[in-house]
Design a protein with these regions (language model features):
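Short helix-capping segments at alpha-helix termini
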Residues: 41-47, 73-77, 116-117, 140-144, ...
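Structured helix-beta-strand junction loops
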Residues: 60, 99, 117-118, 214
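N-terminal helical cap/lid subdomain that shapes the substrate entry/recognition surface
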Residues: 2-5, 10-21, 25-109, 130
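A generic short-segment signal for beta-strand/edge and adjacent turn/coil regions
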Residues: 22-24, 32-34, 90-92, 118, ...
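Catalytic-core regions built around general acid/base machinery
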Residues: 106-118
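Asp-based, Mg2+/Mn2+-dependent phosphohydrolase catalytic module
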Residues: 1-15, 112-115, 129, 133-230
Length: 230
C-alpha cells in the first residue's frame, strides 16, 4: 500500500519507513553467538561470550568475524585466518539462522500499525539478503515489507548512506520523506548521510554504547509505542 499523503511518525511527515533487522525487529544475538561458537573450534580457538559478541554486532558478518578473531589473535594472524573463518561462519550461520533468536515485544503490532497507516515499508540490513529474507519469513514478519535489501544488495553497507538512498530511489520517495527505524549509531549515521530522519530503539545493541547519546527524532522502548499520527 502506498501512502497518498504523508503520515507523521514521531512528529515527522513521511511516506516510507526504512527498518533495520538485527536489534530492531529481532533479537539475533543468540544466532550470532551460536554461529561463532560453531566456527571457532574449527580453528582451535576458544568460545566467546554473549557479552563479547554484542559489542561487535551491527556492521555486517565480515566485521563480526574479523573482530571476533582479534579477541584471540593478533592482527596478522587474524587477517591470515579470515578467509577461511568467514566461509565457515557463513556455512554455520545458514544452519543456525533464526533458531536462537526471538522477535522483540511489540514488533508485530508496530509493523502492523505502520503498514495499516499506508506507509511503504522496506527492510535494510547488513545481513546477507538471503538470510534476512529467511529470518523474516521464519518470524512471520516478511508480509509487512515491500522489499528486503541485505548487505550484499548494494555496493556499500550501513553506516554508508547508499543503501538508504537506493531504497528511497526504488520506493520513489525523497530521502526527506523517509524515516530510518533502527537501534544503533550505524543506522543514525546512514540516515544522516542520506537526509532521512531516524528513530532509535532503546533495547538494541549499539556496540554497548548508550543509544540516547545518538541524535534522533525519537527513542522507543517498543516499536508499537513509536508515535504515529495518520
Amino acid at each position: 500500500m502506498t501512502a497518498v499523503r504523508a503520515i507523521e511518525v514521531a512528529g515527522v511527515p513521511v511516506r516510507a519507513a526504512i527498518i533495520d533487522l538485527d536489534g530492531t525487529l529481532v533479537d539475533t544475538l543468540g544466532d550470532f553467538h551460536a554461529t561463532l561458537n560453531r566456527m571457532l573450534p574449527e580453528f582451535d580457538l576458544p568460545p566467546v561470550t554473549r557479552e563479547q559478541v554484542v559489542l561487535r554486532i551491527g556492521k555486517g558478518s565480515e566485521y563480526l568475524v574479523a573482530q571476533t578473531l582479534r579477541i584471540h589473535l593478533d592482527d596478522a594472524a587474524a587477517d591470515a585466518l579470515y578467509p577461511r573463518a568467514i566461509d565457515a561462519y557463513q556455512r554455520h550461520y545458514g544452519a543456525v539462522n533464526g533458531s536462537c533468536s526471538a522477535v522483540f515485544d511489540g514488533v508485530p503490532e508496530g509493523l502492523q500499525r505502520l503498514h495499516a497507516a499506508g506507509l511503504q515499508l522496506v527492510c535494510i540490513t547488513n545481513k546477507p539478503t538471503v538470510y534476512a529474507r529467511e529470518l523474516l519469513e521464519n518470524k512471520l514478519l516478511h508480509a509487512f515489507f515491500g522489499a528486503v535489501h541485505g548487505g550484499d544488495a548494494f555496493a556499500r553497507k550501513k553506516p554508508d548512506p547508499l543503501p538508504l538512498l537506493e531504497a528511497c530511489r526504488l520506493l520513489g520517495v525523497a530521502p526527506s520523506q523517509a524515516i530510518m527505524i533502527g537501534d544503533s549509531r550505524n543506522d543514525a549515521q546512514a540516515a544522516s548521510g542520506a537526509g532521512c530522519s531516524v528513530a532509535l530503539a532503546t533495547y538494541g545493541y549499539n556496540h554497548g554504547e548508550p543509544i540516547r547519546e545518538t541524535p534522533a527524532v525519537a527513542y522507543f522502548d517498543r516499536l508499537d509505542a513509536l508515535p504515529l499520527q495518520t
